[in-house]
Amino acid sequence: TKEEIDNVTKWDSYRLQQVTADSFEVKKRTGHEECTFIKANWGKRSKGLMYIADEIKGTAFCMHNFWEKYPTSIYADGLCTDNASLTAWMVPPDAEAQDMRHYDTVAHDQTYYEGFPEIGSSAYGIANTNEMSLFLYDTVPSDDELMKQAETVQKPSVLVATPEYYHEVKAMGEWSLPSKDTPLKKWLEEELDKAFAFYKNEVEQRHWYGLWDYGDIMHTYDAQRHCWRYDMGGYAWQNTELIPTLWLWLAFMRSGREDIFTMA
C-alpha cells in the first residue's frame, strides 16, 4: 500500500571515503540531520566513482588516484529531493586535520644533512594537483559500464611516441637508446632496471601514499635501520630538488614502459 511505501526508510545521503591507502568505507544517513551516518559497506582500494540518478538520467563523478591520495571522499546528498548533489573532497570535513608543522623545533643540520633553520619547514606556497571527471547519462548505465568508466579515469589512454622518435628529435637533449652490445652497457642497463624496480616496490612497501606523499619518493636509505632516513634532518622526501622526475621521464622515453610513465 501507499502507506507502507511511505514508511520505507529513505536514505538521503551517502559518503564514500578512502580512509587509508588500504581501506575505504561507505556510510549513509536518512534525511534527518539529527540522525547519524551508519556504515553501509567497506573495502580496500576504491576506484573513486559515485553515481546518482532518477528513473532515467544520471550523473557520475570520479576522482583520479582516489585511493592513492587519501583521505579523498565523494558525498551524495539530497537523494530524496529534486535537487540531489555530488561533492568531491580532496580532504573532507570529517577527515583528520592536515598538520603542516615540522617534527622538531631545530633543523639538525649540524648532525645529519642540510636543514635551514632560518626558514624551517613551512607549508607556504605548496600546491597539489588533482584530476576529476564528470559523466552525464541519458540512460541508466550498467554496473559494468560504471566500472569501465572508473578504470578509464584511473588509467586513461595516453598518446605517446616511440623511444626511437623521442631519440631522433632529441626530446630533453642528448641521450642514448638502450643497448646491451657490450658487457659494460649490459650491466648499466640492468642496473637501471633494478633501480626502477626497487623504487617502484618501495612505493607499495613503505606506503608512500596520501595527499601529500603520493607521487614523491625518498632518498638516502639507512642500511642499519632498514628504512629511509625520513626522520633525520634534511633527508627524506626528494620532491623535485633531487630531480627524480628527470630520471623517470628519461627512463620512460628510453623504454616506452607504461609503469615508468605512471610513476613519473
Predicted regions and their residues:
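Well-ordered alpha-helical scaffold segments within catalytic/enzyme domains
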Residues: 133-138, 174, 243-258
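Low-complexity, Ser/Thr/Pro/Gly-enriched N-terminal "stalk/linker" regions
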Residues: 153-231
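Inter-repeat boundary and helix-capping residues of tandem alpha-helical solenoids
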Residues: 238-241, 261
